[in-house]
Regions:
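Compact, glycine-rich, soluble single-domain proteins
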Residues: 1-109
Length: 109
């Protein structure tokens, strides 16, 4: 992110190898004060981000969180994210499971 950026986003792919659909219901990162689930929508001829309550991952499938689609928005960054910044991320699902991702490498855009 640029030195004074207040927000950034996380992109990744979530795999569901179970027999039931699951939903990502929240995310928390150590590098931001707030983390939200977002998607992009078209409204009045413009593409804009919208906060959403969950991201569904179908059974035996995967969902890609990417630019222009579903993503995790990091708001109120505690420090700039530069190349090789390590980020910790907790993903909470509706099946009462949490996945802790530690020391994720960040990338520059």
């Amino acid at each position: 992110t640029p030195p004074h950026a207040q927000n950034s986003a996380i992109f990744l792919t979530i795999f569901n190898n179970t027999d039931k659909d699951i939903a990502l219901i929240s995310a928390k990162s150590d590098i931001s004060e707030v983390s939200e689930l977002h998607t992009h929508i078209h409204k009045d001829g413009k593409m804009m981000m919208q906060k959403i309550p969950e991201i569904i991952i179908k059974a035996h499938s995967s969902t890609e969180l990417k630019s222009g689609g579903y993503h995790i928005m990091l708001l109120k960054l505690k420090k700039p994210i530069i190349k090789d910044t390590k980020v910790n991320l907790d993903l909470k699902f509706n099946n009462h499971k949490t996945i802790e991702l530690k020391n994720i490498d960040s990338k520059e855009f």
